[in-house]
Amino acid sequence: MKAFILGAGLGTRLAPLTHILPKPLVPVFQKPLIQHTMDFYIRCGIRDFIVNTSCLPLMWERAFPEPTYRGCPVYFSQEEEPLDSGGGVKKIMPQVPQDEPLLVHNGDILTDIPVAELLAAHKRNGNLVTLALRSLDGKRNVGFDEATGKVTDMRHALGVNPGTHQFAGVYLMDPCVAELFPEDDKFSIVPVWLELIKRGKVGGVVFDWAAWHEIGSPEMYLDAVLEMSSRERIHPSATIASGADLGEDCVVGQDAVIPAGCVLDDCIVWPRTHVQPGTYRRCILTPRINVQL
């Protein structure tokens, strides 16, 4: 099975950080967000990746100087302009085997939703699309019948259900779904799903117990990192003066420099950032800008 990670969005909600890096490349602890996703899927047995890109292509080249990651091939699909959630999938379909589902993962989601459980439900229920869902919080715009395991509506577009669950940003899709794609190169995947919902071919699995973080805005990014536990909060190459005061939840990246006179609390310091003396609370510090929250 191949995993397709959506990385071509403009990332407007995460601006101004996405003026520096595409959203999937923002650092989470000591590596880019997308590498956490790839590491998890490698542990799940996936060994083949596709990533669509658009903005800041040079940053992608720096992050992946070769089209591989940990020995696994990575095919990069460059879009001159973002093709939306459906157009991006359509563009990479020639790279997708026709005899197995495609796993699609939103590039701003960090989760450990198990592929095996999603795949088992996909096959068991005869779905063409199976969505990972949540019911704990967030925007509930997916109608889901837990008794049947079927999705019954989305965004109340069919007038069936105003929404009981949230789409978790991960789904499986049989390649034959591409037969329903419009001729346009740029389009949303949602109308395709709605057509399949009417045919009873879209299922869902609720993963409220799984770890799940959306890196959608600077505040969501900071909160997600602060909520996660990691032994890699301070990179060993970082220089932290004895006169600097760092809160225990701060994350400091590679080759960052924090001089005496700095007080940091609940902050993320990106790699190669030279922090100026001062007091920072709930702040994301980068080599170019600081984002105060």
Regions inferred by a protein language model and the residue ranges of each:
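Residues at the starts of beta-strands that form the adenosine-phosphate
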Residues: 2, 47-49, 73, 101, ...
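Glycine-rich phosphate-binding loop at the start of an alpha helix
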Residues: 35, 86, 90, 261
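Catalytic-core segments of class I nucleotidyltransferases/pyrophosphorylases
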Residues: 100-103, 110, 115-123, 134-137, ...
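N-terminal glycine-rich phosphate-binding loop and ensuing alpha1 helix
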Residues: 1-60
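A structural signal for short hydrophobic beta-strand segments in well-ordered beta-sheet cores
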Residues: 25, 142-144, 204
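Conserved beta-loop-beta/alpha segment of the NTase-like Rossmann-fold superfamily
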Residues: 60-146
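Generic beta-sheet signal
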Residues: 6, 28, 52, 77-79, ...
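A structural motif detector for beta-strand N-caps
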Residues: 232-246, 250-252, 256-258, 262, ...
